[in-house]
């Protein structure tokens, strides 16, 4: 399964909750079948959120999982392409995709630990059961 935390480093909720939570998931689920890919999605203040500033942020906040840089909106639009495709309302947004590629959860704002843990546990259990079913007795 995939955890996709979408954020931008000038977003207070992303810095105080989204990024630390994603780093925590990376630590806690290090042995689980999970891929974590951050998405740096910029829909405002483009002039100060370039690649150099992002690199400094990732180093300063010890982000170890890969972070993709969102493509700008098409035809001069301000909403980035992935943000538009997933109908994200802003940042932070967390997207959970299951082992077969289905969107299972999308949360805008603070994804509290209890609900995130429950949802991640369900996906880990499903993935474990799927592997066991394929391998057989």
Per-range role (PLM):
Residues 4-11, 41:
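Aromatic-flanked redox-active Cys/Sec active sites in thiol-based oxidoreductases
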Residues 1-2, 34, 92:
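Alpha/beta-hydrolase fold active-site loops
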Residues 17, 61-63, 70-121:
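Thiol/disulfide oxidoreductase modules built on the thioredoxin-like
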Residues 118-137:
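Non-globular targeting/processing and membrane-anchoring segments
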Residues 7, 37, 68, 84:
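Conserved Rossmann-like nucleotide-binding pocket used by diverse enzymes
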Residues 13-62, 72-81:
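Structural microenvironment flanking redox-active thiols in thiol-disulfide oxidoreductases
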